[in-house]
Amino acid sequence: MATKANVLLIGSGGVGTMATYALQTGGKADVTAVLRSNFKVVSENGFSIDSVQHGDGITGFKPTQILNQVPSAKEGQAFDFIVVTTKNIPDIRPNVADIIEPAVTPGHSVIVLLQNGLNIQVPIIERFPTNAVISGVSLIGATETSPGTVRHDDEDVSKIGVFESPKVPRDVAVAAAKKFVDIYNACGKVDCMYDEDVPFTRWRKLIYNTSYNAIATILRMDTTRMRISEHVIDNLIRPAMLEVKAAAKAAGVNLPDDICDLMIRIDPNDTYWKPSMCQDIEKGNLIEFENIVGEPMREAEKLGVATPVLKTLYGFTKALQFQIMEAKGLISPKWEKDSKYA
Amino acid sequence: MATKANVLLIGSGGVGTMATYALQTGGKADVTAVLRSNFKVVSENGFSIDSVQHGDGITGFKPTQILNQVPSAKEGQAFDFIVVTTKNIPDIRPNVADIIEPAVTPGHSVIVLLQNGLNIQVPIIERFPTNAVISGVSLIGATETSPGTVRHDDEDVSKIGVFESPKVPRDVAVAAAKKFVDIYNACGKVDCMYDEDVPFTRWRKLIYNTSYNAIATILRMDTTRMRISEHVIDNLIRPAMLEVKAAAKAAGVNLPDDICDLMIRIDPNDTYWKPSMCQDIEKGNLIEFENIVGEPMREAEKLGVATPVLKTLYGFTKALQFQIMEAKGLISPKWEKDSKYA
């Protein structure tokens, strides 16, 4: 690439910060980072990072530009890549499409969704039919421990591939994905791979996320205790995983036979790890249940796969979102005399 | 009855206190009450009661005798009735059979289980095969607002019937149940009925308890909000109720077609009522999930009725009990290297 890629990166948690660092220090990208809660701190002092791959004691790191809102695309300065690392909460406006809209140059900006869940590309492709939409599945362990300070303690492995979009030729999208892999890997420290089979990668990750994230959130329980109790694995986690596996199969994705046993044991036991959705509810944050529980359930339904456990998990996580929304003042539940259940 | 019945009453919450009051003031029973948390207060000052049926401002009420532990049966002073109004937590020792054992005179004491749930009689009949075991289903609204102080704000309606026991002739058990109805009603203020069909009464109440109690507990949500959200009713409460109804049917109990719609709407909407199991978990108390969720599920399984929703509710409530037990110091979950899920 002759000139540096003009990258807009939205979302500044652990994943977003480490992506900003890798892209900017690789030298093949100028990163404009859109920050929220940590905007002031990072504008003044830069990020502080302890990283298992980039080194400890990094201070004062700033990308090319730091903004506190999504900029509008300007002529001659279009963003080549718009990387989204925010939570994906489609049940709340503004949703991801709303958030990125001002920055998108139709037919040009490549939209990279570095987010969990199924069918996250659907509303993006609908809104931006002429832009390539790229799947990013990150396996990084990185946490923002206080505003602007990130502890990156597990390797940054990410898989970048193509979401099929009717109006974008596949070779254009593939080239865009491979270019993103190139600029991400330019720092020489991380392991970003081109992903030939995005549905496989996403369904594989859902085996963990749909089960452990939802059940940990409903119970506020770490995954070590689930394995200690055994019954949480036997009566909740495994039945949920088996439904996701069956839905994947019906969608043409054949996951390995031992995938559930592998995912059941994938977390270390000495850290009493709480999955991210559980961390979110404990902080009072909205939860990403629609793409992590709702979409696999709906996909299964379309394909004729019975998912009674997922339906129940969906019912509970949607009810928890209702409570979080009330606590945040986004809704004010009031009893009405003409209610459906009056 | 020539002489007064010698009644032992174990459990001193709202239900237990109002039963003590009705039995003692009716004049056909001498009640020995076994109290725990409120023993000291009530020994000194008696109970304070505001009652929708017995009157407001009752103070200093004491039954014939107040004890702080279950007494041993003494020759010539056997208890005619042992009434149990404690929570029923069979997964913890001492269980109900353990608790009442010292007071039971084999072949004589009639054991009245004024408790919720299915199959609560099974361990009692096993331990005390020669004693009549009586079912009590109470619909009272009574709450102990502070130790020894009870607000009784909804009518005391109870149904008393027979649990079949192989070694106790049915006519003996029926006579015992009817005698209990007589001494309970003697105060002239309450509505205690002989129940011809205990399975019907218990399964009917389970339609509410298995669904609303478990789901409210898992979500810490009142039933008014569930009806406001609608989706909690549609996606959780009704599916659970339908499984209980199907299980009841397989057990030979035909509940009315409209039972679910009736139970969905049975609570007032202006009180934002949290079912008792939800109140328990919010107080850090152990929960009665085995007889309210586990037994209907196991009964359904035996009868070939699929209950995927109940199985999931059971998984969650059992996991919550695990957390409550840990918080109470009853268990100390530790990861072991040779664990099943290592």
What is the predicted role of each segment?
Chain A
Residues A5, A29, S109-V110, N131-A132, ...:
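A structural micro-motif
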Residues I99-V104, R127-A132, T145-P256, D261:
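Internal alpha-helical scaffold of NAD(P)-dependent oxidoreductase catalytic cores
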